């Protein structure tokens, strides 16, 4: 008899679950259908459909089949991909009161600790206070240009190091970017050769890119897995999370303590951190400043490394664009000095070239997901509360309806001429949308310009010729939140004896 009751109870439970599911789906249908997408499996959803590399290309192909708004589910978690920039504007800007939050990312946020930084921070009071710290110092183009001397000095050093060792280009790009951000954020000047602080923060930023990649860790979809013991086979990701958390903790604390020590000694170089500490903030405000400074590095360093690396790859592959930019620099600046940020408005082609670097290979091909704080009906589709809504930045910037010949590198597209209007400024896309737009966009823009302009002024960048054979670089990029060109070879030589003298004389002048 007990077995009979057990069977009846089990059957009733199954019927109840089925009934609740039907009711839920009915309510969902009454509010509107979910956006279309690939058909998933029971319970696991579309887990077998998700791409492991170059997700943006897969999502773009889904858009061609299902439309500009595509949805999938992973273990019940709704994910929406936007393949139209207009939908991104309509949702993230016009309805920013709904779409300004971030999802809870268990691995990167709760386990590693990146949820203290601006990119991952949930929308609310702390988010607004952190953004205010940025806007006070680098919130406008004029504010960002206050740091022009930092930028120009570090790029000067970059030119000297590349002249001495051109085969170490990508290593020097990373070191220079780290030097710029560390000086601006903390007043820290990097050492010659390998610098332990640059190595530390670079490692942490790389870990950020890996840990925030959608679908990289199952615990993001099934948060209960965070309670699995680290010793269980297959749970090596928990040990990884602890190592990454330690790296992030040091990244936040070590340079911050350096600035405090320098201020106490009266030797601090003006920086983001020192400027905010001068007001003697209370302990809670100090934590906010510390995390904001870490945000400046985590958001600015790796993205700039990617963009400057892409610049050198583009110049290797598109020599005609390089020659046009150099001709403009020669005509406007001459050959007796290097370009500065003050020259930017006089160099429209070089500026357009920098924009094309951002468009051709965007540093963040798949934008960080926004998360609606309540159910929304958009374009006739239901976007449930808590959905991960990701803008496909790659698709936006390679849409043939917006950009002619979108896969070619053509800076001219951004320069109006008789009978031709300029194409859309990619900075309106690559730096994000609405209340989550990058607060360091003016600084990033300035950093890319000065790196490109100074390099073009003194270097010829070309394909490597080995044993009489031209080595064609492969245009291939890594997956992850921040995408980088895979290592490539290029030849870098001084444009002239005068250019070489200009680099070395500049360094000798600074040493006197």
UniProtKB/Swiss-Prot annotation:
Cofactor: heme
Alphabetic keyword roster: Heme, Iron, Membrane, Metal-binding, Monooxygenase, Oxidoreductase, Transmembrane, Transmembrane helix
Enzyme Commission code: 1.-.-.-
Gene Ontology terms for molecular function: heme binding; iron ion binding; monooxygenase activity; oxidoreductase activity, acting on paired donors, with incorporation or reduction of molecular oxygen
Residues where heme binds: 438
Location, primary (coarse class): membrane
InterPro entries in the cross-refs: Cyt_P450, Cyt_P450_CS, Cyt_P450_E_grp-I, Cyt_P450_sf, Cytochrome_P450_fung
Taxonomy, superkingdom: Eukaryota
GO cellular component: membrane
Pathway(s) this gene product operates in, as recorded in its UniProt entry: Secondary metabolite biosynthesis
Membrane topology: Single-pass membrane protein
Keyword Transmembrane (UniProt): yes
Residue ranges crossing the lipid bilayer per the database entry: 4-24
Subcellular location: Membrane
Enzyme class: oxidoreductase
Family assignment from sequence similarity: Belongs to the cytochrome P450 family.
UniProt xrefs under PANTHER family: P450, PUTATIVE (EUROFUNG)-RELATED (PTHR46300:SF7), P450, PUTATIVE (EUROFUNG)-RELATED-RELATED (PTHR46300)
Biological function: Cytochrome P450 monooxygenase that is able to use 7-ethoxycoumarin as a substrate for oxidation.
Name of this protein: Cytochrome P450 monooxygenase 208
Gene transcribed to yield this protein: CYP208
């Amino acid at each position: 008899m007990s077995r009979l009751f057990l069977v009846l109870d089990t059957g009733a439970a199954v019927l109840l679950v089925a009934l609740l599911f039907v009711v839920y789906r009915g309510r969902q249908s009454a509010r509107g259908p979910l956006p279309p997408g690939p058909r998933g499996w029971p319970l696991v959803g579309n887990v077998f459909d998700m791409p492991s590399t170059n997700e943006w290309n897969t999502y773009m192909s889904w858009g061609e089949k299902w439309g500009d708004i595509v949805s999938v589910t992973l273990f019940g978690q709704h994910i929406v991909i936007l393949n139209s920039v207009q939908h991104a504007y309509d949702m993230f800007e016009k309805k920013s009161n709904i779409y300004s939050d971030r999802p809870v990312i268990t691995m990167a946020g709760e386990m590693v600790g990146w949820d203290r930084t601006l990119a991952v921070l949930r929308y609310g009071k702390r988010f607004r206070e952190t953004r205010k710290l940025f806007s006070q110092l680098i919130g406008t183009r004029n504010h960002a240009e206050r740091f022009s001397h930092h930028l120009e000095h570090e790029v000067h050093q970059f030119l000297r190091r590349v002249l001495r060792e051109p085969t170490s280009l990508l290593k020097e790009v990373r070191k220079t970017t780290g030097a710029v951000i560390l000086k601006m954020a903390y007043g820290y000047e990097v050492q010659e050769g390998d610098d332990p602080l640059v190595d530390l923060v670079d490692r942490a930023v790389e870990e950020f890119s890996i840990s925030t990649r959608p679908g990289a860790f199952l615990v993001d979809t099934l948060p209960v897995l965070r309670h699995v013991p680290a010793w269980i086979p297959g749970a090596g990701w928990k040990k990884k999370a602890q190592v990454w958390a330690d790296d992030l903790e040091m990244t936040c604390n070590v340079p911050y303590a350096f600035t405090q020590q320098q201020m106490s000694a009266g030797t601090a170089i003006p920086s983001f951190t020192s400027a905010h500490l001068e007001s003697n903030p209370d302990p809670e405000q100090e934590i906010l400043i510390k995390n904001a400074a870490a945000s400046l590095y985590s958001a600015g360093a790796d993205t700039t490394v990617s963009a400057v690396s892409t610049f050198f790859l583009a110049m290797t592959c598109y020599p005609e664009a390089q020659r046009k930019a150099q001709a403009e620099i020669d005509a406007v600046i001459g050959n007796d000095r290097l370009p500065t940020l003050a020259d930017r408005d006089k160099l429209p082609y070089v500026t357009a070239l920098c924009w094309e670097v951002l468009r051709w290979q965007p540093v963040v091909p798949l934008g960080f997901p926004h998360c609606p704080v309540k159910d929304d009906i958009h374009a006739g589709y239901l976007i449930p509360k808590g959905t991960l809504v990701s803008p496909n930045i790659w698709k936006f910037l390679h849409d043939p309806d917006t950009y002619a010949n979108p896969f070619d590198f053509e800076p001219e597209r951004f320069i109006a001429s008789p009978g031709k209007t300029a194409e859309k400024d990619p900075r309106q896309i690559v730096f994000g949308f609405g209340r989550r737009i990058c607060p360091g966009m003016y600084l990033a823009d300035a950093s890319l310009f000065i790196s490109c302009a100074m390099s073009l002024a003194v270097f010829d960048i070309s394909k490597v010729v080995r044993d009489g054979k031209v080595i064609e670089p492969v245009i291939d990029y890594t997956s992850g939140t921040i995408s980088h060109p895979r290592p490539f070879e290029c030849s870098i030589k001084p444009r002239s004896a005068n250019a070489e003298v200009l680099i070395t004389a500049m360094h000798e002048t600074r040493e006197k």
